[in-house]
């Protein structure tokens, strides 16, 4: 999972039995915590990062995407009125694919079984996944997300192992292509489907 720290951390927990020789990673930390590593998208000088979508996990790898929306100060910060705050957040998500607002960055972490440490494997700052929950194909070892580029909603894909091999498919600029924090799923026929502001969007397999 990712936490709510100012610079977000990716946090791993022992799922079942905690190793008998395991010690807390820091004073005051639960033994259940296996790792806690900053998500900085390759820039250790970053003073703030956000990653609010679900972490995508396959094998010993975990990928997070940036939700560091830009130029949203007028709509940020709670008013204390739930309806107004929800409307403001919705407005940010609606604009999250625009060039002035969209976040940039995808980062993969890998668990090293031998050293029992979580390490950054790769970073790609040329890809934007504004709000969709990404997915991964274990068969093809490809990462997918609903992205944005030049004001258009897109499908973005990267090599899960290296972060390279970038592929982009343009979908359109209309809100109907805005994933609005919905999940992305691969279909049995080689296509992709995701929820959007206006319903479900199906992308057939490329031939």
Predicted features by range, described:
Residues 2-13, 38-80:
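Repeat-solenoid scaffold signature
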Residues 13-48, 109-127, 163-172:
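Blade-edge beta-strand/turn elements of extracellular beta-propeller
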Residues 60-174:
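Loop/turn-rich, solvent-exposed surfaces of beta-rich toroidal or solenoidal domains
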């Amino acid at each position: 999972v990712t936490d709510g720290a100012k610079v977000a951390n990716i946090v791993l927990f022992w799922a079942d039995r905690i190793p008998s020789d395991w010690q807390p990673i820091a004073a005051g930390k639960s033994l259940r915590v296996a790792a806690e590593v900053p998500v900085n998208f390759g820039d250790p000088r970053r003073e703030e990062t956000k990653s609010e979508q679900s972490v995508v996990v396959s094998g010993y790898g975990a990928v997070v995407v940036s939700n560091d929306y830009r130029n949203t100060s007028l709509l940020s910060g709670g008013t204390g009125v739930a309806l107004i705050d929800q409307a403001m957040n919705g407005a940010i998500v609606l604009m999250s694919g625009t060039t002035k607002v969209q976040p940039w960055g995808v980062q993969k972490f890998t668990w090293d079984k031998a050293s029992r440490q979580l390490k950054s494997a790769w970073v790609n700052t040329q890809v934007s996944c504004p709000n969709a929950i990404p997915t991964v194909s274990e068969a093809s070892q490809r990462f997918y997300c609903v992205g944005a580029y030049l004001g258009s909603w897109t499908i973005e894909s990267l090599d899960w192992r290296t972060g390279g091999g970038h592929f982009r498919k343009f979908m359109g600029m209309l809100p109907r292509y805005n994933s609005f924090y919905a999940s992305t799923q691969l279909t049995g026929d080689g296509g992709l489907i995701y929820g959007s502001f206006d319903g479900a969007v199906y992308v057939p397999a490329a031939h």
